[in-house]
């Protein structure tokens, strides 16, 4: 077993939301990571939303006004200047064109504004039967009105709004429905047990924000609808950050999943405001990674899987300075096995990384890190699920076969090693766990970590991404010490890198 000395974590402990007082009547901007999977308007995994509830609840309980910012997916986005021109064009059409533009303009108003307009129309009785939500027929009803009445209603509406700023449009040139955070607002309201206000345009929300009272929560629409969020030009990120920073008094980051990004909302807002604190989720992430990379209970095992050695070079190089055991699985294991002279059939292998694999194994030997590689495999001739895959007798894989999971002997070795340890960090699956015949290795590792956490007090950390998904699917996630919400962010921390979204927050004195 290795004897690691003199290695410290480069993660500094940060001020948290508990260090900010009072929150009463303060507008608290909270950058969260609500990048959740959505299919047909339904959220299929709400873990990231649930993980932020303690921070949001703290602000509500203290009488603060909680304003949430997040991204979702990778929409094409538009620039801020394009958005301004688009809004002006829509208002121009609504005002000055007799026979076009009015229904299009009405269609992009928020649902509650549409209801108000229809309530004053000649079709008000029919309007009373329309549900207040989206896609309930409001625009279709408005389209039936005579053109003169449409114009009169919209002119009256715009005149009422002129003192408070023009109404917010629910759809702009950058809007893509599949990336809208509206379903997240609905789910968040269910979890909180209170209404969550929704601003349809994150860059044009001042009027909506002015109506919020103590204890209210508002979610702004996807910040990536604007290209400035992730612009490579600092001045563009800063321009967006200045607008968003004007919405709040205090900045809190609970978005560990995007802490590796130097974006307008992650680093730009705290730069503009001159401060930033960690939410409870961010605090927990920092705390666990600081422990495992600094002075963890020993022995410490790293379980590393995934497709490519090249994706994990920096992680392996950094962790070999810190760990006692290294368990390797997934497709990357076959590059190591071939480097040792084993036959690997048609299994995935990075031929140009064989020397690198040998050097990493030599480095582990020099540092007295015990490396365990698969000693048997679950194989098939094709990349598909079958009822009776081939299980090899040893580490060699037959010609014409590809390994798709670790075998039962390897599982036993890995489970035994995890049982010897006091700390464990896992990044990357052991096989193609999405296919049931090849999920046993990954799920067995998850169960071993869960069992040892509950029975032996193992400090177990899942490094986000596919490992977190596997822990969830296996039912073991709640038995771990910590399941990270950040795949890319946790990987960069394990590589020894500094995360911009963490570094920008105020250090705890």
From Swiss-Prot:
UniProt KW ATP-binding keyword: yes
Pathway per the UniProt entry: Carbohydrate degradation; glycolysis; pyruvate from D-glyceraldehyde 3-phosphate: step 2/5
UniProt-annotated binding residues for AMP: 308, 312, 331, 403, 434
Pfam families, per the entry: PGK
Chain sites annotated for binding ATP: 312, 331, 403, 434, 466-467
Endpoints of the signal sequence: none
Alphabetized UniProt keyword annotations: ATP-binding, Glycolysis, Glycosome, Kinase, Magnesium, Metal-binding, Nucleotide-binding, Peroxisome, Transferase
Cofactor: Mg(2+)
Binding site for ADP: 306, 312, 330, 403, 427, 433-434, 466-467
GO CC annotations, alphabetized: cytosol; glycosome
Annotated residues for binding of Mg(2+): 311, 466
Residue numbers binding (2R)-3-phosphoglycerate: 32-35, 48, 70-71, 73-74, 224, 260-261, 308
GO biological process: gluconeogenesis; glycolytic process
Sequence positions that bind CDP: 306, 311, 330, 428, 433
Enzyme Commission code: 2.7.2.3
CDD domains: Phosphoglycerate_kinase
Catalytic activity: (2R)-3-phosphoglycerate + ATP = (2R)-3-phospho-glyceroyl phosphate + ADP
Subunit (UniProt): Monomer.
Protein name (record): Phosphoglycerate kinase, glycosomal
């Amino acid at each position: 077993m290795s004897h690691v000395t003199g290695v410290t974590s480069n993660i500094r402990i940060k001020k948290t939301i508990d260090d900010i007082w009072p929150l009463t009547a303060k507008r608290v901007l909270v950058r969260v990571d609500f990048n959740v999977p959505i299919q047909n308007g339904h959220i299929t995994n709400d873990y990231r939303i649930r993980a932020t509830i303690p921070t949001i609840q703290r602000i509500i309980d203290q009488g603060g006004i909680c304003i949430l910012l997040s991204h979702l997916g990778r929409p094409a986005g538009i620039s801020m200047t394009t958005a301004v021109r688009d809004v002006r064009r829509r208002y121009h059409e609504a005002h000055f064109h007799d026979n076009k533009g009015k229904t299009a303009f009405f269609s992009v108003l928020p649902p509650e504004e549409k209801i108000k307009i229809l309530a004053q129309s000649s079709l008000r009785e029919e309007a009373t039967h329309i549900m207040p939500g989206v896609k309930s027929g409001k625009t279709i009803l408005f389209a039936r009105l005579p053109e003169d009445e449409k114009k009169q209603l919209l002119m009256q509406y715009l005149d009422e709004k002129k003192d408070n700023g023009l109404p917010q449009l629910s759809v702009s040139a950058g809007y893509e429905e599949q990336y809208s955070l509206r379903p997240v607002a609905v789910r968040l309201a269910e979890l909180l047990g209170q209404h969550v206000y929704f601003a349809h345009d994150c860059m044009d929300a001042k009027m909506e924000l002015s109506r919020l009272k103590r204890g209210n929560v508002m979610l702004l629409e996807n910040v990536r609808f604007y290209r400035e969020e992730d612009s490579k030009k600092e001045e563009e990120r800063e321009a967006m950050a200045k607008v968003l920073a004007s919405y709040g008094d205090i900045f809190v980051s609970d978005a560990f999943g995007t802490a590796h990004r130097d974006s307008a909302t992650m680093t730009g807002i705290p730069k503009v405001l001159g401060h930033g604190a960690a939410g409870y989720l961010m605090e927990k992430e920092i705390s666990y990674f600081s422990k495992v990379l600094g002075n963890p209970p020993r022995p410490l095992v790293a379980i590393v899987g995934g497709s490519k050695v090249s994706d994990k070079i920096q992680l392996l190089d950094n962790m070999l300075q810190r760990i006692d055991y290294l368990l390797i699985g997934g497709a990357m294991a076959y590059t190591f096995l071939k480097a040792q002279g084993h036959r690997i059939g048609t299994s995935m292998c990075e031929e140009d990384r064989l020397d690198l694999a040998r050097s990493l194994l030599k480095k582990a030997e020099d540092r007295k890190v015990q490396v365990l590689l698969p000693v048997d495999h679950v194989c098939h001739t094709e990349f598909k699920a079958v009822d009776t895959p081939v299980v090899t007798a040893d580490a060699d894989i037959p010609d014409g076969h590809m390994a798709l999971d670790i075998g039962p002997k390897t599982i036993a070795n890995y489970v035994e090693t995890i049982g010897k340890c006091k700390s464990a960090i896992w990044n990357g699956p052991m096989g193609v766990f999405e296919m049931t015949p090849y999920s046993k290795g990954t799920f067995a590792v998850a169960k071993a970590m869960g069992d040892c956490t509950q029975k032996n007090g193992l400090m177990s950390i899942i490094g986000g991404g596919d490992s977190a998904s596997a822990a969830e699917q296996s039912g073991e996630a709640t038995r771990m010490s910590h399941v990270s919400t950040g795949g890319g962010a946790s990987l960069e921390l394990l590589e020894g890198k500094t995360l911009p979204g963490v570094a920008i927050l105020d250090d705890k004195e």
